[in-house]
Amino acid sequence: LLGFESGLFVSSGLMGNQISLLNHTNPGEEVITTQDSHIKNYEHGAASFLSRIQFRNVSHNDGDLNLDDIVSQISKSSYYKPKISTVAIENTHLASGGTIIPFENIKKLSEFTKSNNLKLHVDGARVWHAILEENTKANYGKYCDSLTFCFSKGLGAPIGSMLLGSKDFIANSREYRKKIGGGMRLSLIHI
């Protein structure tokens, strides 16, 4: 799906995003994102509670991170500052009115993250809106390490989200989902 090897049902986008951070980070590290991103501001402080990480803000244009700003943040890293391990983007960007990050820009960001040994996570709660608007196949799996999308946003389902990634990433994610109470054993067919 979307070019990823594997996927995992999770009860919410918040759970999918947080499981991604648990996989991609170690305690004390930083995640680059926008000041007004959902993963930073609207997930009840879950990242600091579960992963014990913090966020580093970069400038953006309607959700599209400024690559030059990311480069400068990476170059400012030092022994005295937390290690930056992950970049988290949101497509579409809710706080910017649902604006779309062009897929070509995601490819450029991916090239940068890979060359700097960083993980790239997409909070794609509304990713189907972006794919339809851009009229693209959007092979996110080729360019991103993980992606979460919501079944109720754009697809009309009553509950749940999917977390996508590599087979190893999803195997680890399945364990994290169980540890934080997301197995939903009695409410759904075994997933």
Task: Describe these PLM feature segments.
Residues 47, 141-171:
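Active-site PLP attachment segment
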Residues 189-191:
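Conserved small/polar residues in nucleotide/adenosyl-binding loops
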